[in-house]
Amino acid sequence: MMTKHEEIQKGVIFPAGEKNEAYAQVFTGQSYLNMLVNDPEVSVGVGNVTFEPGCRNHWHVHTDGYQILLVTGGEGWYQEEGKPARRLRAGDVVVTHKGIKHWHGATKDSWFEHLAITSGNSEFLEPVTDEVYEGLENQ
């Protein structure tokens, strides 16, 4: 299978960062993380997250805050529980409010990158099953 958007593996606007070992247990596949704001006086996290093709995070909720995703490259998915998945491309913006169960990640044949601006804590839940993920390509 041909992989799309391979140029993203080096980063689009910001460098892709290191392998995301700290969160590897809540991802299916390989992701990379470059935290862009490391100021302890700033109450939001800002990170550049890069996903290899097929990589996605587990279902999760932001328990006491929110998350804004600014898509910078590639093709990916965003899905809230009980709703159809949304295909994401560069320029798309997603706002996830407190308590909404969701996941996001790359399509199976494309690299994907977004900036994640996150306030508060995240609670990671079960993985997105292969059955659910593979079914998205048919939407």
Question: Which residue ranges define each predicted feature?
Answer:
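A structure-centric signal for secondary-structure junctions around beta-strands
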Residues: 43-45, 65, 111-112
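A short beta-strand-loop-beta hairpin characteristic of the jelly-roll/cupin
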Residues: 56, 61-90, 100
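A short, polar/proline- and glycine-enriched secondary-structure boundary/capping micro-motif
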Residues: 69-70, 89-90, 115, 125-127, ...
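A short, N-terminal "cap"/entry segment at the start of jelly-roll beta-barrel domains
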Residues: 1-44, 124-139
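Conserved hydrophobic/aromatic positions in well-ordered beta-strands
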Residues: 34, 47-49, 69, 115
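Ligand-binding loop in jelly-roll beta-barrel domains
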Residues: 40, 77, 85, 89-90, ...
